[in-house]
Amino acid sequence: MFRFVSSIKPFVLKKSYLKQYNVKLLQAKFDVLMTAYPEIKAVLPDDISAKKLLVGNFKYLTKVYCAFTSYLNGKSTKDRLSIKNAFVRGGFNYDSHKTKISNFLMDITNQFEIHNCIYCDIEDVTTFTKANGTKVRKFETEHVLDKGDCPLVGMSLYNFVPSCRICNGPDIKGTKTIGDSETEIARLSPTAEGYDFANKVKFEVKILTPGVEDLKATSHVDDYEIVFNIGEALYQKTIDLFELKSRYNHGIVKLELLKWRDIRRRNPDNMVQQLADINMIPFGEMFEELFELDFRRRMHYPMEKARRDVMLID
């Protein structure tokens, strides 16, 4: 739903991430694998290296993933498992590095914004600190490209997206890719350059019952549905994969959005101005008091995009 990027310069971030590894040793192990599997080497990008696997951009990772998995698809189940296990044992074992990877993402000096699930924006995944000073990680380090299908991208910086357990679980995303072709996959990761779900998709409230009294939607929620106005068809795949329509129409999530729609409809700009005049405060201050835009942005409230969209507030 939102791009997942650090606010520091990319070359600084990459340099910091590479320091987490013995890149020379990983390159040596990779060279051994390429010697052992020349047919795989032949289908991978010519400029592939351990460094590029660790910090290459998502489009590059997609190319590696698609080449590797396409090659394996031509093999028997037994051979596929054997090859993948060989790459895991040969140096590309995410489990051996997962603690330092999650710590890297949580490290405030790396300036990642991790507050709500990047995919759904419904679940709060903010890391918190216990009384004894220990940090508790609430997010899951989700692999956009499955590490089980392609161990080569298992430790790749731009393959990580902090998500909630629901989005990362087997009933939703699991090991699936977002998109079907290499081109689609390369564009649909929140880590991809040009990813723009937030601006290309808008939440809207649809009235299901013609002629229904449209004053207090929260009192008859079944007459309404949360839908998506999709400016670029590609993002429908994200909506479908993460079951966003079902989840935003479920229980308290839907009720909360309808509540704020009601509040906005009762308080159009002319009413806000009247209230501001009565209270002798500026329009902007009154607007903030009613709709909490700055406050919720600062506090990183979940579902804030959807809330603003249904209130028709940019």
Question: Predicted segment positions?
Answer:
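Short, flexible, mixed-charge glycine/proline-rich loop motifs
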Residues: 103-113, 152-157
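Extended, Lys/Arg-enriched charged tracts that mediate electrostatic binding to polyanionic substrates
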Residues: 115-118, 125
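Short cysteine-rich clusters marking metal-coordination/redox-active sites
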Residues: 117-120, 164-167
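Histidine-centered nuclease catalytic patch
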Residues: 122-159, 173-179, 184-186, 191
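Intrinsic-disorder/low-complexity loop/linker signature
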Residues: 38, 74, 132-133, 180, ...
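N-terminal accessory alpha/beta regions
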Residues: 1-105
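Domain-level detector of nuclease and nuclease-like folds
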Residues: 151, 170-236
